[in-house]
């Protein structure tokens, strides 16, 4: 058994990130679900879908929830789920974070959450660009 993974984001971010990570790794070693929150969709309906996903994903080791922006609706839904289920929430999802998690499917939920944060942080770089000669 491993930790389940639920991505809750605005619009098509979760699906796009998950599909890209799967293509890059040629596999997806964790049970995952993507849930998008349209701007005009009733929160109660999204919450019901999220609870169904949690019930499917949690095989006894909990569910790591990744959201896009802390304080926005997807993260608020995630926070509520953490109050009701065995979940951990990490906000600020990016592709390096997701790839890092999928490379360590054997971790417990606490260590996976820490790996998510380090992967997301390490994947953000200020790149120096040199002018090219004309």
For the regions a language model picked out, list residue spans one by one.
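N-terminal loops that bind phosphate or other acidic moieties
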Residues: 2-64, 69-134
